[in-house]
Structure formats: structure tokens, C-alpha cells
Design a protein with these regions (language model features):
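Cytosolic-facing regulatory segments adjacent to core modules
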Residues: 9-111, 236
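Phosphate-binding/switch region of NTP-binding enzymes
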Residues: 7-11, 142-249
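Internal alpha/beta scaffold segment
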Residues: 1-5
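Phosphate-binding/switch loop-helix module in NTP-utilizing enzymes
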Residues: 83-146
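Generic beta-strand/beta-sheet core signal
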Residues: 31-33, 86-88, 118-119, 155-156, ...
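Amphipathic alpha-helical transducer elements in NTP-driven molecular machines
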Residues: 38, 65-68, 72, 96, ...
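Flexible beta-alpha connector loops of hexameric P-loop NTPases
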Residues: 56-63, 84, 124-134, 166-175
């Protein structure tokens, strides 16, 4: 499970899975409930072309010929990526039916890896209370990850607790915690790994946490839960989100 800036990070993962595993057969199913699929493709173009999405989408100026040729070239490459998008919010049961259909149609009986990405959990069509909906969604994902060679990457939001003045002004409370994740109990228990991506700079924090880490142009990845390897840890990235990218420090 991943929380913010979630969509850019997950979008990068989806294409990297394909780019970095050229000898593997992969099927990627993305529930893009927060953003329509073509916007996700736009972010991929931004990352690969080193152009901001505002530049690519702008109606004020035309793209120069070289950039336009690159857009066409990369777009043709992306058409070959084994990635499918679901744009419309679904109930947990509807999501389960879609996952089962894709598994039976494209994966079952093959040696393909099946990757399910869900962005994001709180946009699921409700079947009752938020807690009831999240519990049912987690049941779906626990069942889905039992398919052979299947991984589930679900995205969620942080709540507003981390933005409180008490947290911002106390360096011992800067780091994300389990309770900062919306619907934390259901999502945390169902996940093998829980990762929080945090930009303390946008909260006005200049020195981050008890180690007084620099925040300028930094993004920190906190692994709060690691079922196989134990202790939590923090990874540091350079902020390259203008191009929908993160650079490992």
C-alpha cells in the first residue's frame, strides 16, 4: 500500500515494471479512479520526454517538431505496453469481478505476472460505511493476491493529522505513522508492505525528524510495514515530480 504523492510514484512503477523486465510477460490492470487513463499516459509522456504535462497539454503554443516526433514515437511504444485502465469507480464486488475476468482472460494458464494497481482506496463505490467498504475491498485484494504470480498495489490517502501545528512544530512527530493513513486498520492489516511517500517541504518543515534531514527538493519514502524483512526504514529521493519522476539519492 502506498500513500501520497501516490499517483506519480505508482505511474512510474507501472512503466518501470515493463521497461526493467523485458524478458518477462506481464499483465498490468490499473484501477485509475482518481484520474482518467489518458491523464496517466500524459504523465508517462512527461517522465519519458522530460516535459511538464502543462507544456504537453498547452494550447497556447505548438510543440516544436522535434518534441512532436518524440511524442509520437513514445506514444507508439506505450501502445504496446500490456497495461489496461479501469476509470469508473466500482464497488468491491465489481472490482473483484473485473480482476477475475482479467485473470481468466489474460493470465490463467500462462506464465505471465499479473499486477493489479488500485488508485485509490477511498474512491471505491461505497456499499455501506467507509469502514465496511474498506473491509470488503481488502477481502477482495487478499483473495486476488493468492492467484499465482499476482501482486496488488493499492494506493490510499493520508488523513490531516500530520498537518497539525503540533506535529509540524515537534520534530519527534514529523514522520508518518500508521494512524496517519485513512482507514488505517483495514488497509494496514491486509498489506504485506506499507509505504508512505512524504514531502515535508510543503508543510514548511526545513529540518525533518530527529535526524534533522534536509527537506529542500526532497521526497522521503517511509516503509512502515515490511512483512518479510522486519524493521521500518526511510529512503530519500530528489524531487523530480515536475516531470512525474523521483530520483533516488
Amino acid at each position: 500500500m502506498i500513500t501520497k504523492p501516490k499517483s506519480s510514484f505508482a505511474n512510474e512503477i507501472s512503466t518501470d515494471i515493463v521497461d526493467l523486465n523485458p524478458d518477462e510477460e506481464i499483465v498490468i490492470l490499473i484501477f485509475s479512479l482518481e484520474m482518467v487513463g489518458f491523464r496517466q499516459v500524459g504523465r508517462t509522456l512527461s517522465s519519458k520526454l522530460r516535459k511538464t504535462t502543462s507544456t504537453l497539454y498547452s494550447s497556447e503554443t505548438d510543440l516544436d517538431d522535434d518534441t512532436f516526433r518524440k511524442v509520437i514515437s513514445v506514444s507508439n511504444q506505450l501502445k504496446e505496453y500490456p497495461i489496461w485502465f479501469v476509470d469508473n469507480p466500482t464497488t468491491p464486488k465489481e472490482a473483484e469481478d473485473i480482476i477475475r475476468y482479467f485473470y481468466n482472460t489474460y493470465v490463467k494458464g500462462t506464465n505471465k505476472h499479473f499486477v493489479i494497481m488500485y488508485d485509490h482506496a477511498l474512491l471505491t463505490k461505497p456499499i455501506g460505511s467507509v469502514i465496511e467498504t474498506m473491509q470488503e475491498l481488502e477481502r477482495v485484494f487478499i483473495s486476488a493476491k493468492k492467484y499465482p504470480m499476482t501482486s496488488v498495489l493499492q494506493l490510499a490517502q493520508m488523513n490531516r493529522n500530520i498537518e497539525s501545528p503540533e506535529r509540524i512544530n515537534n520534530f519527534l512527530s514529523h514522520y508518518p505513522m500508521r494512524s496517519d493513513i485513512s482507514s488505517a486498520d483495514a488497509l494496514f492489516q491486509a498489506s504485506d508492505y506499507v509505504i508512505v511517500i512524504h514531502r515535508p517541504e510543503i508543510l514548511g518543515i526545513q529540518e525533518y525528524g530527529p535526524s534533522h534531514l534536509s527537506t529542500q527538493n526532497k521526497v522521503y519514502l517511509h516503509i512502515l510495514k515490511n512483512r518479510d524483512a522486519g524493521k521500518p526504514c526511510i529512503l530519500e529521493f530528489q524531487n523530480d515530480l515536475a516531470y512525474n519522476n523521483l530520483i533516488e539519492s
